[in-house]
Amino acid sequence: MKNISTLIKPISSKCNINCKYCFYKDEDKLRKDGCFEKMSLKTLELIVKRVFEVATNQASFVFQGGEPTLMGLSFYQSFISFTKKYNVNNIKTFFSIQTNGILLDKDWCIFLKENNFLVGLSFDGTPEINDINRITYDNKGTSNLVINSIRLLQKYNVDFNILFVVSHDAYNKAKESYKYCKNLGIEYLQIIPVLDPFGNQKESESYSLSKKDLEIFLCDLFDIWYNDFINNKEVRITYFENIITSLINGKGTMCSMNGLCSIETVIEANGNVYPCDFYVSDKYCLGNIYDNNLKELIFSQKAIDFISESINLKNDCTKCKYCNLCIGSCKRYSLNNKNEYKNYYCETYQNFFNYTLDRIIKIAKAYSS
């Protein structure tokens, strides 16, 4: 295999805060064993060994949770030692960690900088929005702690971006959120529509995002971003940049814009491997790294079946004039009824593209020239 990317869950779903919308904690109920115990160094070393057994050009390691910093800094120092031990062919490596930032301190930041980690830091736009859903176990907001972490990352020149979960509480505050993040010195922003609990009816929670909510948010965010873009002052927003890339190259870099799922190689704390962190259930478990190498797991019949499920686009999608920009989006946002597949936010995205397409084309032409 030329390139391989792994998404490692060393602490399973355990976390030091209690976000109301946490989809990964919700997935515990889809596994007989629920939340796994924390990852051992033996399992971590085996993961690294397995990756370098099959990767010939590039290896990416992404750590997520739960909250992965709960493993402690020494765990990641051991990880770096293992990569040096097993990367005998000196292939390219990329390291990333997604965190709420609360445990970050000087030592963490020095380590992350020295080892070229990209940090994904969770923060929902403004303190007021963030502190509605991203709370501690005693119901206190976390924004002050996260902003302190942002300042630390900036002080030590650690590369990072902000992960912004868009909920109902944020739908009419896109411009306010953009300005706040920009004033914080944020350069990269990823927006992620909130997920309803697995198996629940859509819009069943106080934080749930309606179709109109997402439309308002995206259109407002695009307006302020576009005005900054034409003045070369924009915060880079992954979703908008992927739309432009799709127009230019016919394909984005986000898996949700590729038309079908791929195997993300999610590795849980006990060594179980899953195709995607939205599908970490017993039903979708591909096997365990103690029993199989990664090539066997990634090309297993279960993995092929998982990918095949996502190809089942409805005819409405293939007839849509925006199909090349959306391609049905991520199936986790879809409605499934007797194997029928349609993105819940289909009308939302159509209205968004109707509103923005002329400007998107202008940007794409500017990039192309």
Where are the language model's segments positioned?
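Ferredoxin-like iron-sulfur electron-transfer modules
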Residues: 1-10, 304-312
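Radical SAM/AdoMet-radical enzyme domain recognition
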Residues: 44-62, 71-194, 203
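Short, ordered coil/turn segments that flank beta-strands lining enzyme active or ligand-binding pockets
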Residues: 269
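Flexible mid-to-C-terminal extensions adjoining Fe-S/redox cofactors in radical SAM and related proteins
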Residues: 280-369
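Cysteine-centered iron-sulfur cluster-binding motifs in ferredoxin-type domains/subunits
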Residues: 11-18, 67-70, 261, 317-319, ...
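Canonical Radical SAM [4Fe-4S] cluster-binding loop centered on the CxxxCxxC motif
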Residues: 2-42
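Radical SAM enzyme [4Fe-4S]-AdoMet core and its adjacent flexible, acidic
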Residues: 134-144, 151, 155-256, 260, ...
